[in-house]
A protein has these predicted regions:
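Extended catalytic cores of very large enzyme megasubunits
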Residues: 1-233
Length: 233
């Protein structure tokens, strides 16, 4: 049982927590709903409800590059401090919230060395994860830096993954599931000791509906018109 679920069970009058979710940041400040400003709103809401949120920063341009407006990019690393501060402040406000936030960056991003060597003291409430593929073997300096940081406990390492259609899917906080941006991993519990075998399918379906709709209020509007998910909408 995750800590945030256990915390809710101890005080079920609070909103049930989302367990884990993913956000892929687009390379813009505010011209796209999934830009940096959108990621701050998304992370804030997730952390307020005790969620774990993985923020993938690899689409951001490298530090020092210019955009079409002549603005100089900050790169992905400086924004990690904002996400760390979000987690720190939201944990302290009111009732303690057992949220978590992880910043992800691909190993082939030009700023990866800054990412893995970033001063931990500046991002105490944030974890880091490096997304790698077999090509990392061809960059021994990067590989050594990543492995050294992993040995010190400064970063985690996860493989890049793609779905059956060749589309990128992204690791969540615990690295137990791969999701697309804004997708969510939900946790609930079914007591198999009191369920007849014939009732198991219904138990899981009812459990998911109860979890997604009745408790979290995070039911996605996109699901209302889809034909591929559990809801059969």
């Amino acid at each position: 049982m995750t800590g945030r679920v256990e915390s809710w069970l101890e005080n079920p009058t609070r909103r049930y927590p989302i367990s884990c979710t993913v956000f892929v940041v687009e390379d813009t400040m505010d011209e796209h709903p999934d830009g940096l400003e959108g990621s701050w709103q998304f992370a804030s809401k997730a952390l307020r409800y005790g969620a774990g949120v993985a923020i993938h920063l690899s689409k951001l341009r490298p530090k020092g590059t210019k955009n079409s407006h002549g603005m100089v990019a900050s790169g992905p690393c400086g924004f990690m401090e904002i996400f760390s501060k979000f987690n720190e402040i939201l944990r302290r406000g009111g009732t303690y919230r057992n949220g978590a936030i992880v910043a992800h960056c691909d190993a082939d991003h030009p700023d990866i060395l800054e990412f893995v060597n970033y001063d931990r003291a500046r991002i105490p409430w944030l974890k880091r994860c490096v997304n790698v593929d077999p090509d990392i073997i061809n960059s021994p300096d990067k590989l050594k830096a990543i492995m050294d940081a992993a040995r010190k406990g400064d970063v985690w390492i996860v493989k890049k993954q793609y779905d059956a259609n060749g589309e990128r899917i992204y690791s969540n906080v615990c690295q137990e599931i791969l999701l697309k941006s804004r997708d969510t991993c939900l946790l609930s519990h079914i007591n198999l000791g009191i369920v007849e075998i014939k009732d198991i399918p219904t138990a899981f379906k009812d459990g998911m509906e109860f979890l997604c709709v009745d408790l979290t209020t995070w039911f996605l509007s996109d699901c209302q018109s889809c034909d591929s998910c559990w809801c059969g909408g």
